[in-house]
């Protein structure tokens, strides 16, 4: 039986913040199984994560991480750090390497002493700290093309949001397993903020208006 899978997720570091973005389509073979799939989760006050791959495996990981983050806070009175959270997940995945979780994970967070942090993890527990950006899922090759061409480490949060959405939009236009809207989170020293549909629509609307203006200018020049 086919499992629900297929997605595009993006994570990037910008001016003192981490931005995570995902699409909302879950596919089962060639069938679109869910048009409102949740792939972006808040783990703690300063940590969020994205999932790609087998939905059941990914959701089990999300539940485990949320529980561990709460236990850590109960025992220590502090929030777990993004690095500790990523390392914990790496250990969980590696311990199950003979029967791996079929998923790719991005963990983004804000360390109050060390700034924004971004990590990517593979199904066997391999963990990479990303200094710029990362992407996972079936649409990631397309998203990477946009990120490689336009990313700037010093970009503002608004610019970072627009780039993440542009990378997702490009992937959704070419990858049949990605689509049906987006979810976005911004993580700063103030904590995790999940953007509303209205805020996302506004950002996408601004990009569309700029694109129309550019195309109009090109037409005028060609005339």
From Swiss-Prot:
It is an enzyme of class 3 (hydrolase). It is found in: Cytoplasm. The formation of the proteasomal ATPase PAN-20S proteasome complex, via the docking of the C-termini of PAN into the intersubunit pockets in the alpha-rings, triggers opening of the gate for substrate entry. Interconversion between the open-gate and close-gate conformations leads to a dynamic regulation of the 20S proteasome proteolysis activity. Its EC number is 3.4.25.1. It holds the Pfam family Proteasome. Residues 1-6 form a propeptide. It catalyses: Cleavage of peptide bonds with very broad specificity. Signal peptide: none annotated. This is Proteasome subunit beta.
């Amino acid at each position: 039986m086919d499992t629900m899978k297929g997605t595009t997720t993006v994570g990037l570091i910008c001016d003192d913040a981490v931005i995570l973005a995902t699409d909302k389509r879950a596919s089962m073979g060639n069938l679109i199984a869910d048009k409102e799939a949740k792939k972006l989760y808040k783990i703690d006050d300063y940590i969020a994560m994205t999932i790609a791959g087998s939905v059941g495996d990914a959701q089990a990981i999300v539940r485990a991480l949320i529980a561990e983050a709460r236990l850590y806070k109960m025992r220590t009175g502090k929030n777990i750090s993004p690095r500790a959270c990523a390392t914990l997940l790496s250990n969980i995945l590696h311990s199950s390497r003979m029967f791996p979780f079929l998923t790719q994970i991005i963990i983004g967070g804000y360390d109050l002493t060390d700034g924004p942090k971004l990590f990517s993890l593979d199904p066997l527990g391999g963990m990479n700290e990303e200094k710029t950006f990362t992407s996972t899922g079936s649409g990631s090759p397309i998203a990477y093309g946009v990120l490689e061409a336009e990313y700037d480490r010093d970009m503002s949060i608004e610019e970072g949001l627009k780039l993440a959405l542009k990378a997702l939009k490009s992937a959704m236009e070419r990858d049949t397993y990605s689509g049906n809207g987006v979810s976005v989170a911004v993580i700063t020293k103030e904590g995790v903020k999940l953007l509303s549909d209205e805020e996302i629509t506004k950002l996408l609307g601004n990009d569309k208006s700029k694109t129309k203006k550019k195309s109009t200018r090109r037409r005028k020049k060609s005339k």
